[in-house]
Amino acid sequence: MRFIATHCYDESLGVIVTEASGLAEPGDILALYNKLHCLSGRYHCRKALVDLRKVSLSYDSASVLYTLDRLEPLLCNLQIARVVEDLDTRQQLIQEYADKQKLLMRNFFDRQTALDWLKTSLDGTRLQAGLATMPG
């Protein structure tokens, strides 16, 4: 299945919402977060919900880390709640990377918990690593 990502700004929540599906290559993920970064500037919004439950990564863990290194400059000023499937160990690797780099990026298994984290967190401040971690 071809990779597709849609983005919209939810003004009532003050959150950029991204939904993606399909088989993702590293370039697809880079484009997704680059677009998110651009939209954050356009809407003056630093909070994002990224729903990746319908995405399959087509690359290995080493490529995941390489991709994250390239993405870090785009992610460092955003607060990102990622909704993911709990069966993919690469998603946990991404969470561990975010914790290590002190990025405001957390994985969640359901959309409402992710939105709650975005609403209750202070905009523009860095939370302590591990404050909102994936259950399990």
State what each model feature region is:
Residues 1-136:
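Amphipathic, Lys/Arg-enriched alpha-helical "gate/interface" segment within cytosolic domains
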